[in-house]
Amino acid sequence: VGFARERTGEGRGMSILLDSVRSGFYARKQINSRSRLIAWSHRGRFATGLRLAQEVPGARTLDYGCGDGTFLALLMNGASAPRIAVGAELTPEIVSDCRERFKNQKGMHFILIDDLDRAAHQGAYDAIYCMEVLEHVVDPAPLLESFSQLLAPGGTLVVSVPIETGLPVMVKQIVRRVAGWRGIGHYPGTTGYTVVEMLRSICARSTQHIARPVITRDDGTTFHDHKGFNWRVLRTLVGERFDLVRESTSPVAWLGPQLGTQRWIIARKRAASASAENVA
């Protein structure tokens, strides 16, 4: 994670985190991937998130789907650190791992996603980050509504999702196949595209362009993989519930969605009256 020290200027404080961050599951397979292209893409994603954090004020931050806690650890040791940062994940195993690795970091807390239903969390957060999560959610609308409830008045939602349309999807599928052959990450299980599906994905606009596979876990819950995800469709859903502020692209902003690998959507919670009118 040396990139973080260089780009965000945390200096000596960052060195304390190096071992804790490096040992994280997602850090190992993403920012420290054996594939230089994959590592570059994800390092750029984290750097973009930290840069955007400078535009998002607030004392209490939630990272929904925090994974191994890498982003929160970098955020809490950067120039835009909130007073309290909460990471939420699905399983007790992930939460326990994060708590153990970052037990010496003040202001960082890790909880189960189900814990967010408690009254203490309603309206409690000035900013919510949801990175590389919503593309996997079969029905994002209820989750977006939950974010609105968790945010304080005027709070900010920062979303990042993969770009799986246009030229990027073709390049990504090639990279995933090569990574799969090399035994890197989860890429051996990448869902394939037919020729027609790939053409529709390359030419996709603002409506859903192909059917998305629904995968069922052993516990009966369902999720999507990346196939067929359209960030423009999600942007419309976000805009129905929040005021869209701006968008960005990573790993390099000037690439735009035509060539970038992730799209960022920054939105602000609407006033109660405006939200009620929109729902009606």
Task: State where each predicted segment sits.
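S-adenosyl-L-methionine-dependent methyltransferase catalytic module, highlighting the catalytic core
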Residues: S15-G44, E93, D114-D117, V138-A152, ...
